[in-house]
Every structure is written in C-alpha cells, then in structure tokens.
Amino acid sequence: MRVGRILQADLDALPQSVSETVDYIDSLQRRVAFSYLVDVLSRRDHSTKEIQDKLKGQGFSPSSIESAVEKARQSRYLDDARFASYFVDERVRRGWGRIKIEQELQRRGVDPAEIPGYPEEFFDEHSDVERAAALLARKSIPENKPFEKLVRHLMSKGFSYSIARDAVQQRLCRDS
C-alpha cells in the first residue's frame, strides 16, 4: 500500500522495461519496509519476531522484511538482547514472576537462555519472595480458602508454587 502510493505519486520515475520496473519496485519496497521498521522502533523497542510480524502484517514481501531486519540489526536499531534485558527489568518492576516473564519472552520470539546473565542477574529466591509478598500486601485476604486463592493469584502472576507458598504463609501468619 505504501509502495503503491509512492509509485502513484511518481509515475514518471518508472523505468521503461519490465525487468527494470520490477527491480525498481523491489528496491522501493525494501526502502519503505526499512522506513516503516525505523518508525515502529522509534516508539519502543521490539523483538525481531515482533518486527517481522508487523512488517508481514503490512504486506511487505519476505525478501523486503529480511532486508529491512538485517539492515536494522547492522545499524543496531534492532537488538534482541537489549530488548530482552529491558523487557525483563521492566516486568520485574511491575511484579511479574519468572515463569510469566519467560512465557512472554517466548511468545515474543526471544529465548530466555540467550539473554546474557539470565536468570542470575535478574532473579534470586529472596527478592522473588519479597516481590510476591509486596503483591499480596495490596490484596485483601479472602474469607473462603485464603491460602489456595492467594497462591493461585501469585502463580497467575508467574511465581513458582514454592515462592507463592512461602509468601502466602508469611502473609497469613503475619495477619493471623
């Protein structure tokens, strides 16, 4: 669509032969794909898979997508390690647990094992229990089956059962 608009605006620039026209359109599509990619990345960082999906959704050809992604990587506009590191830091600040963060990274096409220093630099058992306890501090204790409901709540936030259990036990003992 974007390429078509540019072509329509500048019909005089089209070469006369078919092969030259095809090459011209292919070149134009690659430039437009890269321009769109930079525009998307100017708003926030994305993973390579997210960018590829966005470009595909805009109707760019696979070769244009590949070219734009490669150019963005070489220019360091697109960096999965940087994206993943920022993503994990941000989600930890929001109170997400390790399991939920890993699932979300995989959904976004990033393998957590490829993140430098993951998980040691981002998580430790003590801080996980503290973050889980902080989430519970904002939640009222249900009257019916409080242990099960609070553990389920923490597990839905991505905390392991053992961390959720410890945090809930601390909260219930403190408030009893």
What name fits each language-model region?
Residues 1-176:
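An alpha-helical, amphipathic repeat domain used for nucleic-acid recognition
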